């Protein structure tokens, strides 16, 4: 008997499988392979019938009022309370009392007896300030007959006003001392500016005395001396050295405060400007101070030459 080839073996296996499938054993064999043959679980979903205990323990909802409303063509939803209108009695509130109560709550000084007295807490505070405004330090303490307005602004405005209280103090003695300190700093600033101005004037006048003779004195002929350009070179060199030194000086000196237009704008609206742009504007204000000083020095030179040309000396 000859051995079967591989193709014949595969053919016999296919025929056996077809015979098994034709006998209906394919589904059982598939379940055996997938492991579902020994599963005891049922695919039917049992329906749960309510027990007697559940029906007896359930809370019965009142339906008599609901049926009455439905029969009377009422909307049952209208009986549900609105959280937004809770506590609203239908009367229009007084706007002044509403604003005063909002300020009192934000300041944390609610006075339950203020409504009984007829005067809100906020109004009493302002009236006390006005009553004590003519005595003492403009009503800055209890001794002056009023209250400290910084305390009021701090309670209403928050941390930004608190910085002002830290700067000026909370007691009359601290306020008076800090006022004197601020006035002293302003005086020192003015003295410093005066010294800088004197130094500039001395340098410019000395330069004009030494080099100004060689410069032309006539504004009509516009003639120049042979070494007249040396004055401008020395003047610009000294200005460059002076302006550079002054820039580093005013950057490190806290007592020096400039009165430029940019600084005034920063003092007014600095809180609304981002920190990056605020630093750039502060640097620009220093350059503006230097530019104004240079223009002032140049104007002195022009005025001196104009006077010499006019009087011809």
From Swiss-Prot:
Classification via PANTHER family: GOLGI TO ER TRAFFIC PROTEIN 2
Transmembrane segments: 192-212, 231-250, 290-310
Cytoplasmic compartment segments: 1-191, 251-289
Annotated function: Required for the post-translational delivery of tail-anchored (TA) proteins to the endoplasmic reticulum. Together with GET1, acts as a membrane receptor for soluble GET3, which recognizes and selectively binds the transmembrane domain of TA proteins in the cytosol. The GET complex cooperates with the HDEL receptor ERD2 to mediate the ATP-dependent retrieval of resident ER proteins that contain a C-terminal H-D-E-L retention signal from the Golgi to the ER.
Compositionally biased spans, kind Polar residues: 35-45
Subunit structure: Component of the Golgi to ER traffic (GET) complex, which is composed of GET1, GET2 and GET3. Within the complex, GET1 and GET2 form a heterotetramer which is stabilized by phosphatidylinositol binding and which binds to the GET3 homodimer.
Protein name: Golgi to ER traffic protein 2
Membrane topology annotation: Multi-pass membrane protein
Species annotation: Komagataella phaffii (strain GS115 / ATCC 20864) (Yeast)
Keyword Membrane attached: yes
Subcellular location(s) per record: Endoplasmic reticulum membrane; Golgi apparatus membrane
Family assignment from sequence similarity: Belongs to the GET2 family.
Compositional bias segments (type: Low complexity): 52-63
Lumenal compartment residues: 213-230, 311-313
GO BP: protein insertion into ER membrane; retrograde vesicle-mediated transport, Golgi to endoplasmic reticulum
GO CC terms, sorted: endoplasmic reticulum membrane; GET complex; Golgi membrane
Keyword entries, A-Z: Endoplasmic reticulum, ER-Golgi transport, Golgi apparatus, Membrane, Transmembrane, Transmembrane helix, Transport
Residue numbers spanned by region Disordered: 15-78
Main location: endoplasmic reticulum
